[in-house]
């Protein structure tokens, strides 16, 4: 699977897993969260005797009835210093274990570059790890990693890169030097480049073998058009000329430079030692040759349209969505949209989509919603599920109906409380290690967030009410405008796709 297909598959899996796709059986059927549970302990029509004792909760109701004091958590605050060239470094001491974490994050990626750099930018994170350094060929880097128990992490998206290294304190000299070499002096070994290119070519040719990933990729392409968010890796992107060491080095110079970077160090190292090492390695790092041009905002498709990809498969993938309208920031609509999304489909088995599609109707193992937001522009609000071909139209209508229900009727207090508690209490897992705390601060700086963003976010989420959820759903979510994309065997659908809206067939 290609880099973009893999990332989309990961997104798809994350959405589905977040919606509770864990068990194979259906188990006991819990009540829908927006409805009173039916009383199955007495015959129909029989009323409980006056003054009868209330029945104690059983099964899942016992767990849902549990209440805990609200979690109060204050993360340690990293220190911050600058190198002689202005590069910011975050530092957090932690001597509880003989470990040191080194982190570099960069603003940049294929979203900032022309299409002919798409493959080079996509390959960058992988080749920083596998492509060697100017001092060491790839196999020598592998030997160092194994001999000194170094743990190297690389990651990328359309707009960010990360290169992190974890090492035992006693191996810090070796680990730090290798980390700095990977950042400043990558080799981009031609054989490793060709290996990456060959794998991506095969993945691009086989993308249709993965219907779930195909649905997400094609949906993004439909919604975002010729915007980086909608790009799909194609063989024409993967020519040797577009992935040469020279092109990789030129792309590296554009992105991996001080004005795009933030560094971090945490663990068993003093601040003075961290300053010395960082200044020696990065204090004279040459400035960026040019300023990266900010990506243009996407023009997201509006208006009902049904897109169908015919595949001879027993299960359909359904994706629905529209422009989400909400921007990430310290505002009521953003916080209310977080709670609304959790209730709609982000809260696992407690979410309405899972309740309706799985528990009530038995149409799917799971379903999930997403409500994207960025500081610069709106993203997508929508949902995704898989269902058997013969229930495709019914499942699609049920998703849209659940959304319509949420935009016309406020959620219950208990739904909002559960969503709020889940988000707030889950926040602690964003700070399970000093490295995570430092990395969070680095990301906030790259995104120009206020330093107290975390506390603002928690306060904003805690202030959400059922009324504000109803308001944000009513103003920003309209199922009648949703774009629908279905991958499946149309001949086995429980109706024609045209009953949902005007149909366009896609041929990837």
Model-predicted segments: where are they?
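C-terminal regions of mature proteins
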Residues: 21-71, 262-264, 385, 418-508
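M16/insulysin-pitrilysin zinc metalloprotease superfamily fold
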Residues: 22-24, 130-136, 165-197, 347-348, ...
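Acidic/histidine-enriched segments that form metal/cofactor-coordinating
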Residues: 25-35, 40-58, 140-251, 297, ...
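An aromatic/glycine/proline-enriched structural segment found at the starts
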Residues: 47, 51-59, 225, 229, ...
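Histidine-acidic residue clusters that define the catalytic metal-binding segment
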Residues: 57-81, 221-261, 293-298, 324-328, ...
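M16/MPP (pitrilysin/insulinase) zinc-metallopeptidase core fold and M16-derived inactive scaffolds
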Residues: 103-166, 231-233, 347-365, 375
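Short acidic/His-enriched helical or mixed secondary-structure segments at domain edges of catalytic enzymes
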Residues: 199-218, 297-316, 355-364, 409-460
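Non-catalytic, conformational "gating/processing" segments within enzyme and secreted inhibitor domains
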Residues: 212, 216-217, 221, 245-281, ...
């Amino acid at each position: 699977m290609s880099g973009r297909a893999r990332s989309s598959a990961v997104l798809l899996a994350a959405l589905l897993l977040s919606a509770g796709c864990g068990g194979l059986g259906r188990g006991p059927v819990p009540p829908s969260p927006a409805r009173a549970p039916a009383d199955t302990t007495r015959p129909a029509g029989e009323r409980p005797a006056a003054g009868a004792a209330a029945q104690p909760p059983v099964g899942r109701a016992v767990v849902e009835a549990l209440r805990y004091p609200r979690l109060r958590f204050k993360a340690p605050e990293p220190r911050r210093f600058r190198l002689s060239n202005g590069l910011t470094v975050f530092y957090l001491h932690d001597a509880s274990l003989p470990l040191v974490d080194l982190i570099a994050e960069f603003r940049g990626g294929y979203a900032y570059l022309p299409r002919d750099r798409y493959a080079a930018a996509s390959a960058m994170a992988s080749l920083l790890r596998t492509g060697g350094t100017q001092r060491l060929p790839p196999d020598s880097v592998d030997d160092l990693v194994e001999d000194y128990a170094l743990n190297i992490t690389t990651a990328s998206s359309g707009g960010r890169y990360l290169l992190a290294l974890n090492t035992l304190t006693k191996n810090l000299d070796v680990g730090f030097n290798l980390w700095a070499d990977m950042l400043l002096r990558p080799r981009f070994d031609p054989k490793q480049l060709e290996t990456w290119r060959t794998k991506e070519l095969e993945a691009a040719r086989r993308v249709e073998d993965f219907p779930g990933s195909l649905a997400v990729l094609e949906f993004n392409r439909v919604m975002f058009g010729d915007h980086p968010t909608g790009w799909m890796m194609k063989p024409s992107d993967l020519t040797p000329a577009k992935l040469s060491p020279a092109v990789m080095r030129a792309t590296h110079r554009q992105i991996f430079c001080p004005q795009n970077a933030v560094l971090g160090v945490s663990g068993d190292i003093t601040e003075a030692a961290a300053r010395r090492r960082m200044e020696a390695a990065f204090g004279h790092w040459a400035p960026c040759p040019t300023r990266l041009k900010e990506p243009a905002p996407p023009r997201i498709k509006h208006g009902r349209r049904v897109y169908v990809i015919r595949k001879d498969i027993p299960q359909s993938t359904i994706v629905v969505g529209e422009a989400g309208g909400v921007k990430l920031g310290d505002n009521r609509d953003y916080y209310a949209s977080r709670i609304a999304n959790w209730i709609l489909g982000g809260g696992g088995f407690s979410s309405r989509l899972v309740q309706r599609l799985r528990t009530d109707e038995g149409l799917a193992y799971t379903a999930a919603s997403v409500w994207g937001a960025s500081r610069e522009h709106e993203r997508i609000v929508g949902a995704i599920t898989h269902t058997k071909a013969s229930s495709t139209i019914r499942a699609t209508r049920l998703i849209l109906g659940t959304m319509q229900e949420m935009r016309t009727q406020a959620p219950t207090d208990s739904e909002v409380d559960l969503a709020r508690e889940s988000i707030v209490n889950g926040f602690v897992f964003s700070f399970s290690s000093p490295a995570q705390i430092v990395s969070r601060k680095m990301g906030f700086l790259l995104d120009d967030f206020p330093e107290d963003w975390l506390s603002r976010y928690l306060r904003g989420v805690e202030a959400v009410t059922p009324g504000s959820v109803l308001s944000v759903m009513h103003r920003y979510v309209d199922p009648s405008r949703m774009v629908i994309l279905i991958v499946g065997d149309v001949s086995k659908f429980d109706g024609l796709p045209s009953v949902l809206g005007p149909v366009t067939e896609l041929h990837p």
